[in-house]
Amino acid sequence: MLLIPAIDLKDGHCVRLKQGDMDQSTTFGEDPAAMARKWADAGARRLHLVDLNGAFAGQPKNKAAIKAILAEVGADIPVQLGGGIRDLDTIERYIDAGLRYVIIGTAAVKNPGFLKDACSAFGGHIIVGLDAKDGKVATDGWSKLTGHEVVDLARKFQDWGVESIIYTDIGRDGMLSGINIEATVKLAQALTIPVIASGGLAGIADIEKLCEVENEGVEGVICGRAIYSGDLDFAAAQHRADELSLA
């Protein structure tokens, strides 16, 4: 089970948002590269970056911070990034800079042709982030709920060659209310590609529950507010997950 620390970037700083609201942000660090190194040293085997300004602007914004993170840890562990990725040129620039995976969210739903092209051009590097509430997909930084069923869309994306799906339950994100295991497993069972859980990770109990369903196709979990608030000791949690995976 991959525990993937999230570094959310806003105006060059590491922040956490509550329920995806840019006006409800808490700053956790002024130096994103140092934060990346901290998590790598704590045993992270992948990092999850979000360009928050980029997600809302529809184009990359925190380039300097992303570059600094890749320079710091990019040679040691794979880094994945989402937020504001809307064209193939942006993907190419990021991959050339050392990014392992590019996460396409809103654009995958609104512009499926772009996702198809991205999978053709950069096979093995494309992850789709699906944000959902009650099984329906949301877009535009969660501000718009669509009529699309998560499972239907994910199956289509799988057929196009997407590497994996990050599934976020937006009713829970940033709330420390526990991962929606049931919905995550339901999605994973419907697919042959891995699913990464996200949204609401509260503590070690969630990690233990996720390890129980790892064989259903749940590959990892994004660790956000819980590792910054102190509700989850990241190094201890990854160690516990490894123990359970070996059991």
UniProtKB/Swiss-Prot annotation:
Reactions mediated catalytically: 1-(5-phospho-beta-D-ribosyl)-5-[(5-phospho-beta-D-ribosylamino)methylideneamino]imidazole-4-carboxamide = 5-[(5-phospho-1-deoxy-D-ribulos-1-ylimino)methylamino]-1-(5-phospho-beta-D-ribosyl)imidazole-4-carboxamide
EC number: 5.3.1.16
Gene Ontology CC terms, in alphabetical order: cytoplasm
Subcellular location: Cytoplasm
Positions of the catalytic residues: 8, 131
Pathway of action: Amino-acid biosynthesis; L-histidine biosynthesis; L-histidine from 5-phospho-alpha-D-ribose 1-diphosphate: step 4/9
Predominant place of localization: cytoplasm
Single Gene Ontology BP annotation: L-tryptophan biosynthetic process
Pfam families named in the record: His_biosynth
InterPro entries membership: Aldolase_TIM, His_biosynth, HisA_bact_arch, Isoase_HisA-like, Isoase_HisA-like_bact, RibuloseP-bd_barrel
A GO term, aspect molecular function: 1-(5-phosphoribosyl)-5-[(5-phosphoribosylamino)methylideneamino]imidazole-4-carboxamide isomerase activity
Keyword annotations: Amino-acid biosynthesis, Cytoplasm, Histidine biosynthesis, Isomerase
Family per record: Belongs to the HisA/HisF family.
PANTHER family documented for this protein: 1-(5-PHOSPHORIBOSYL)-5-[(5-PHOSPHORIBOSYLAMINO)METHYLIDENEAMINO] IMIDAZOLE-4-CARBOXAMIDE ISOMERASE
Name of the molecule in the record: 1-(5-phosphoribosyl)-5-[(5-phosphoribosylamino)methylideneamino] imidazole-4-carboxamide isomerase
Species this protein is from: Acidovorax ebreus (strain TPSY)
